[in-house]
Regions:
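Flexible, glycine-rich terminal cap/loop adjacent to redox cofactors
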Residues: 1-9, 14, 21, 25-35, ...
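Glycine-rich Rossmann-fold phosphate-binding loop(s) that bind the pyrophosphate
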Residues: 8-9, 146-149, 279
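FAD-site-proximal beta/loop scaffold in flavoenzymes
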Residues: 124-140, 227-304
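Glycine-rich dinucleotide-binding loop and its adjacent helix/turn
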Residues: 20, 111-165, 169, 197-198, ...
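Short hydrophobic core segments
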Residues: 87, 102-112, 145-146, 166, ...
Length: 434
């Protein structure tokens, strides 16, 4: 098929330029700083070590730029036309980019999302979103991060390990509020060890950038008022689908109650030939979900055999602080609301040989199953690089493997993944090493 991509700013998207990729580079530097700052004695390391955030920043940009160049290479290799500019629909079969008019048979809308702000809060030099912060080479002395989701927690980890005084304020009762409650507790404990101040159940009232400092006032769930003065504020309270400003209304495409583009299982909108993927659909605002949706949309347009994605709750999720968080499916609380008999199996990394050898005993593997059928309902991991372990669980869930079948899958010893095998055993009887 003859194919073109229209992009105004970030070839490769937010992920490659100011999101997933550069943040992982910064997190890797922060992990190394954490080892020297907190675990040097454990590993027999002594002496003075300095940490240059500017060098970490430069490395993150180099990594990002390299992958973006790879995107351009792949576009050229596959004969895809690149169109630089801002595209605006004039109808469901036409887009105008500056003076250029582009017609097509099919279109995939992948316009992403935009940062949500609290009412009354305005961005400024010192009140910023993730995009400005990840493109800033200098560190503040202190920062308030508003929102304890994945982005807020990842930035908190990086900045704290480079000596920034970090306070995280979350309106809901716990950090990572969409994760299992045990996960939230474990991460809150780890962050407090880092010296990060966490205020949950707390609503930000005002954010006042006074030039040399920012004053944040807040009220907790007991009605107590407080304030904090910092160098900078990072707003990370969530995202909204980007559906305005590019003529979507001229296409007749329907929106959901959340303001997202409504799609079916094949990413089709209500308008023939118009598809949508990614954050603009608000199914699950993660890069790998957008990629998976894109594959389904492309295969559908081409008339090729495809496989729909099913329940988006079963998509893998991760937060890349250390210890990392990785999960899929239902939390324990959600499972107990939906199923009459739920089994929970949990194995701590403190009882895992590889974790002990690595000095990475924080966290656990937790499995939630249907006690009547051994069906996997959810998996929740906290620990060193556990995001790499999650695909075993999501693959098993996708192909309807039970805990009993998974318990017979031999895991390499010694590996962190043996903790998952223990949860499989625990779900059907008893664990071996606990």
């Amino acid at each position: 098929m003859k194919t073109a991509v229209i992009e105004e700013k970030w070839w490769g998207g937010v992920c490659l330029n100011v999101g997933c990729i550069p943040s992982k580079a910064l997190l890797r530097n922060a992990e190394l700083a954490h080892v020297f700052n907190h675990d040097a004695k454990t590993f027999g390391i002594s002496g003075e070590v300095s940490f240059d955030f500017g060098a970490a920043f430069d490395r993150s940009r180099k990594v990002s730029d390299g992958i973006v160049k790879g995107v351009h290479f792949l576009m050229k290799k596959n004969g895809i036309t690149e169109i630089d500019g801002y595209g605006v629909f004039t109808d469901a079969k036409t887009i105008q980019v500056d003076d250029r008019v582009i017609t097509f048979d099919n279109v995939i809308i992948d316009t992403g999302s935009q940062v949500r702000l609290l009412p009354g809060v305005e961005l400024s030099d010192n009140v910023v979103t993730y995009e400005k912060q990840i493109l800033t080479r200098e560190l503040p002395g202190s920062i308030v991060i508003v929102g304890a989701g994945a982005i807020g927690m990842e930035f908190g980890y990086v900045l704290a390990n480079y000596g920034v005084d970090v306070t995280i304020i979350e309106y809901l009762p716990r950090v990572l509020p969409n994760e299992d409650e045990d996960v939230s507790k474990e991460i809150a404990k780890a962050y407090k060890k880092l010296g990060i101040t966490i205020l949950t159940g707390t609503a930000v009232q005002t954010v006042d950038d006074q030039g040399s400092q920012v004053v944040v006032t807040y009220r907790d769930d007991k009605g107590n008022d407080g304030s904090i003065t910092v160098d900078k504020v990072l707003m990370s309270v969530g995202f909204a689908p980007r559906t305005e400003g590019y003529g979507l209304e001229t296409t007749g495409v329907a929106l959901t109650d959340r303001g997202a583009i409504a799609i079916d299982d094949h990413m089709r909108t209500n308008v023939p030939g118009v598809y949508a993927i990614g954050d603009v659909t608000a199914k699950l605002m993660l890069a790998h979900v957008a990629e998976a949706q894109g594959v389904v949309a492309a295969e559908t347009i081409a008339g090729a055999e495809t496989m729909t994605l099913g329940d988006y709750r079963n998509m893998p999720r991760a937060t890349f602080c250390q210890p990392q968080v990785a999960s899929f499916g239902l939390t324990e609380a959600q499972a107990k609301e939906e199923y009459p008999n739920v089994k929970v199996s949990k194995f701590p990394f403190s009882a895992n040989g590889k974790a002990l050898g690595m000095g990475a005993t924080a966290g656990f593997a937790k499995l939630v199953t249907n006690a009547d059928t051994d069906e996997l309902l959810g998996g929740h991991l906290v620990g060193d690089n556990v995001s790499e372990m999650l695909p075993e669980m999501t693959l098993a869930q996708k192909w309807d493997l039970t805990a009993k079948e998974l318990a017979r899958n031999v895991h390499t010893h010694p590996t962190m993944s043996e903790a998952m095998q223990e949860t499989f055993h625990g779900a059907i009887g008893h664990m071996i090493n606990l």
